[in-house]
Swiss-Prot record:
One of its GO terms (cellular component) is cytoplasm. SUPFAM superfamilies: Glyceraldehyde-3-phosphate dehydrogenase-like, C-terminal domain, NAD(P)-binding Rossmann-fold domains. This is N-acetyl-gamma-glutamyl-phosphate reductase. It catalyses: N-acetyl-L-glutamate 5-semialdehyde + phosphate + NADP(+) = N-acetyl-L-glutamyl 5-phosphate + NADPH + H(+). InterPro entries: AGPR_AS, AGPR_type-1, NAD(P)-bd_dom_sf, NAGSA_dehydrogenase, Semialdehyde_DH_NAD-bd. The active site is at 154. The lineage of its organism: Bacteria, Pseudomonadati, Pseudomonadota, Gammaproteobacteria, Enterobacterales. Pathway: Amino-acid biosynthesis; L-arginine biosynthesis; N(2)-acetyl-L-ornithine from L-glutamate: step 3/4. One of its GO terms (biological process) is L-arginine biosynthetic process. It is an enzyme of class 1 (oxidoreductase). The keyword Cytoplasm applies. GO terms for molecular function: N-acetyl-gamma-glutamyl-phosphate reductase activity; NAD binding; NADP+ binding.
């Protein structure tokens, strides 16, 4: 049994982690924590997230020193802000824990990337070297030996799952950059109240045009340039990405389908559509990424959907933990 600590459990992704870890037959929750300054400290997780009432009624404990919580802990999930994960991960690693970080603090092995896109100076370049990128379907072997796993961002997960098989099979003309138009539910902005996320203000709107930090994350791990435009949707959760690409001359629809099938035939959390394209409603609340596509001449449109809090965050983190410790990949997820 793996003793498991969830840090930042009060947020949306944190609550989903609590659900998955609680029903995992090989994990035991040792504590749920929030920052010492959090207004949620001392409250029950089930008071903040009533879907957990009678299932997990543990208190959210304030954490000011990791030594109060790290003894005897095998696994730590960090559902915390980027700067917080940056500071906490090295301490938990030093304490002998395996760390799964849901923030962006260790996703890209480039110190300059953090200064430009995250606004802080990264103090642990050696951990950027060591961290395994947790795109579970593609990086499984690296996960098996890693002690620090950087769980990918929500947008990058869907984008890479859709594009990697086609790039690896050399089917795309990358002189024309893939164009990724992605829309996410408001939960992607977190639980904190903000006018821009309120019911009467939220609208379908692009943001972070040419500046969003997920663009370089996608491009770095794909090994190919992309144009990425995120949009805020007026719905609670889920991500839908419509990706437009150019195929190399002579590439057929059959070849595209074969590349996707070969990549995901034995990957249970990626569901491929033989006909048509996926709808968001079919993945919300589930740990899957659904992918469909259409071809017209040399033009390819791929549609990928996922729940941003699940396959885009908590479910993928638990999937990575399952791979790391040799459990069934879908354990506690489906």
């Amino acid at each position: 049994m793996l003793n498991t600590l969830i840090v930042g459990a009060s947020g949306y992704a944190g609550a989903e982690l609590v659900t998955y870890v609680n029903r995992h037959p090989h994990m035991n929750i040792t504590a749920l924590t929030v920052s010492a300054q959090s207004n949620d400290a001392g409250k029950l997780i089930s008071d903040l997230h009533p879907q957990l009432k009678g299932i997990v009624d543990l208190p959210l404990q304030p954490m000011s020193d990791i030594s109060e919580f790290s003894p005897g802990v095998d696994v730590v999930f960090l559902a915390t802000a980027h700067e917080v994960s940056h500071d906490l991960a090295p301490q938990f690693l030093e304490a002998g824990c395996v760390v799964f970080d849901l923030s962006g603090a260790f996703r890209v092995n480039d110190v300059a990337f953090y200064e430009k896109y995250y606004g802080f100076t990264h103090q642990y370049p050696e951990l950027l070297e060591q961290a395994a990128y947790g795109l579970a379907e593609w990086c499984g072997n690296k996960l098996k030996e890693a002690n620090l796993i950087a769980v990918p961002g929500c947008y990058p997960t869907a984008a890479q799952l859709a594009l990697k098989p086609l790039i690896d099979a050399d089917l795309l003309d990358l002189n024309q950059w893939p164009v990724i138009n992605a829309t996410s539910g408001v939960s992607g902005a977190g639980r904190k109240a903000a006018i821009s996320n309120s019911f009467c203000e939220v609208s379908l709107q692009p943001y972070g045009v040419f500046t969003h930090r997920h663009q370089p994350e996608i491009a770095t791990h794909l090994g190919a340039d992309v144009i990425f435009t995120p949009h805020l949707g007026n719905f609670p959760r889920g991500i839908l990405e419509t990706i437009t690409c150019r195929l190399k001359p002579g590439v057929s629809q059959v070849q595209v389908a074969q590349a996707l099938q070969q990549a995901y035939a034995h990957k249970p959390l990626v569901r491929l559509y033989d006909k048509g394209v996926p709808a968001l409603k079919n993945v919300v609340g589930l740990p899957f990424c659904d992918i469909g596509f259409a071809v017209q001449g040399e033009h390819l449109i791929i549609v990928a959907t996922e729940d941003n809090l699940l396959k885009g965050a908590a479910a993928q983190a638990v999937q990575c933990a399952n791979i790391r410790f040799g459990y069934a990949e879908t354990q506690s997820l489906i």
